[in-house]
Amino acid sequence: MTRYYCEYCHSYLTHDTLSVRKSHLVGKNHLRITADYYRNKARDIINKHNHKRRHIGKRGRKERENSSQNETLKVTCLSNKEKRHIMHVKKMNQKELAQTSIDTLKLLYDGSPGYSKVFVDANRFDIGDLVKASKLPQRANEKSAHHSFKQTSRSRDETCESNPFPRLNNPKKLEPPKILSQWSNTIPKTSIFYSVDILQTTIKESKKRMHSDGIRKPSSANGYKRRRYGN
């Protein structure tokens, strides 16, 4: 059975499964060895660069460069005193950040499409699995007050009515296109569509249709209708 080999710890894991590999990569021993490796590598590169700047000469320059390339990197671990000092400084920085809440980015990206995937720890892809949650089912987990949704949450069916581009709201409107001015020629001159008294005319016509014997102008001078004979 194939097993996962860690290049930093120089050891094989028990199984090559995702859970075993993940538990190893987040372990304290692996993180410490990885941090020491990159710290020592950066320190050696800096020392090598400073050494070259101090000892630049024409005689034997190529030999010194070839010999320095063939040298193996020496892993030098920090002393306990240096580690305690680094941990103390790190705790002080974390305490300072916890006391002073920096909400500049949160306010800047408030309401953006990817806000919940960046500023909510439970939704992040990198540290989302490390957030402490209760042992209840997934939909019953209660978020802490630090991760509570305030006004930044957006429901699925919510329609955003706020204007995302306030600078583009100019009270001065653009003139209509020139092509629209030709449409006035297509309307007949006898049309009453744009008439001012169209409402009153419509009401009068409706009344005439509703009442068969509506108010009409008499056909004769005496006010009596003439009887028609024949067809």
Curated annotation (Swiss-Prot):
SUPFAM superfamilies: beta-beta-alpha zinc fingers. It comes from the Eukaryota. SMART domains: ZnF_U1 (SM00451). GO terms for cellular component: commitment complex; nucleus; spliceosomal complex; U1 snRNP; U2-type prespliceosome. Residues 49-71, 137-177, 205-231 are annotated as: Disordered. PROSITE patterns: ZF_MATRIN. Gene3D superfamilies: Classic Zinc Finger. GO terms for molecular function: mRNA binding; pre-mRNA 5'-splice site binding; U1 snRNA binding; zinc ion binding. HAMAP family: U1_C. U1 snRNP is composed of the 7 core Sm proteins SMB1, SMD1, SMD2, SMD3, SME1, SMX3 and SMX2 (Sm proteins B, D1, D2, D3, E, F and G, respectively) that assemble in a heptameric protein ring on the Sm site of the small nuclear RNA to form the core snRNP, and at least 10 U1 snRNP-specific proteins SNP1/U1-70K, MUD1/U1-A, YHC1/U1-C, LUC7, NAM8, PRP39, PRP40, PRP42, SNU56 and SNU71. YHC1/U1-C interacts with U1 snRNA and the 5' splice-site region of the pre-mRNA. Component of the spliceosomal U1 snRNP, which is essential for recognition of the pre-mRNA 5' splice-site and the subsequent assembly of the spliceosome. YHC1/U1-C is directly involved in initial 5' splice-site recognition for both constitutive and regulated alternative splicing. The interaction with the 5' splice-site seems to precede base-pairing between the pre-mRNA and the U1 snRNA. Stimulates commitment or early (E) complex formation by stabilizing the base pairing of the 5' end of the U1 snRNA and the 5' splice-site region. Belongs to the U1 small nuclear ribonucleoprotein C family. This is U1 small nuclear ribonucleoprotein C. It comes from Saccharomyces cerevisiae (strain ATCC 204508 / S288c).
